[in-house]
Regions:
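Alpha-helical transmembrane segments of multi-pass membrane proteins predominantly involved
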Residues: 1-177
């Protein structure tokens, strides 16, 4: 199960890295989906509540699908100015390894590594957004990462937050238009 947790943690990190590097709806949705799959795999492998893990999976997938409906079309990957976010993606994973440290030998520790990496990178992205759709995608990813640090109720709350943020409109309304 440790290998499954490790695959989940890496997949979650790759997903949140995509959220961090994307500015358009497809990139955000695919990143959110990848993060969801990774965190769900890690949660199941670490022995978390099966119902909580299922709720996390459902909420993340619904949030990702809802993110496809509005915002800037396309992928929006690696736009000018995104190099610091790419560097941050690598550094955050290394920082999460140091932070989790000695508990990496067990599936729970590996799952925690993925959740910490997701939460840190999503938080960094949330603080640097320029568009509302990026903020909503990063917020949903942050909710999933923080929820994955807990058990049943935290996983369900994270799923609800991801769906709620996915349901919000990403287009800014302009007064007078």
């Amino acid at each position: 199960m440790e290998a499954v947790a490790a695959i989940g943690a890496v997949l979650a990190w790759l997903g949140v890295s995509l959220v961090s590097l994307a500015d358009a709806r497809r990139g955000l949705a695919v990143g959110l989906f990848g993060t969801t799959v990774g965190l769900t795999l890690a949660a199941v492998a670490s022995g978390r509540s099966p119902l909580g893990a299922a709720a996390l999976a459902a909420g993340g997938v619904i949030g990702a699908v809802l993110r496809l409906r509005d915002g800037e079309p396309g992928w929006g990957l690696m736009r000018p100015g995104s190099t610091p976010r790419l560097v941050a993606a690598v550094l955050v994973f290394l920082a999460a390894v140091v932070l989790v440290g000695s508990s990496l030998g067990v599936p729970v520790g590996v799952a925690r590594l993925g959740a910490v990496a997701v939460a840190l990178l999503a938080l960094l992205r949330l603080m640097t957004v320029e568009h509302r759709s990026s903020a909503l995608g990063a917020g949903a990813t942050l909710a999933l990462g923080l929820g994955a640090l807990g058990d049943g109720p935290a996983l369900v709350a994270a799923a609800a937050a991801a769906v709620g943020l996915g349901a919000l409109r990403a287009t800014e309304d302009r007064a007078g238009t």
